Amino acid sequence: ATEEEIGTIILGNNDDVDIAVKAANLAFDNFSKTTKEDRLKLLKRIHEVTSDCFEELAQAMSKEMGAPITMSREAQADSGLGHLQGFIEALEKLEEENTLSNGDILTKEPIGVCGLITPWNWPINQITLKVLPAIACGCTCILKPSEHTPISAMLYAEILHEAGVPSGVFNLIHGTGEEVGVALSRHPDIQMISFTGSTRGGM
């Protein structure tokens, strides 16, 4: 390690969480009403942009984690694309409404705003496993990546923006688990939390 600076982030706080939750709730009103076809088109566009940024993602994770570049390419960045393709195929097969044998109708609906907390050791793997199914189902989300691997999360936010994810559907807040993580997991206007890591991450 050379201790050379590779990037700069701003650590968020409780106020930032409140702002992001408000934006996500506002965006949910419209995004939750999108069709499956709309969201499939969006996921496929995300796949295109992610493919274009594959090497940039791999380099970012290699630098922030200290991982060999071959691992960053073949295990880290590649898993992000693989998960995305899997969610596209799953959404294509998803039946949003089923009639049960007794005549009742089972309807699958987006749950609301999702708070997503990810660890340092598999950054894009974990980000895609949480962010993409939320988007696929019509939910909005707020991501808090590990403060130790923030660069790849920033790059992924740029990918989602370039792909056309609507404003407020995806929100990124950098910060510690003790502050931002706790604020997310305790927020009354977040309907679901997906958390991977130790309790230090914010539970």
Q: Where are the language model's segments positioned?
A:
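Rossmann-like NAD(P) dinucleotide-binding subdomain of oxidoreductase/dehydrogenase enzymes
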Residues: 96-203
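N-terminal Rossmann-like NAD(P)+-binding subdomain of aldehyde/semialdehyde dehydrogenases
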Residues: 1-103
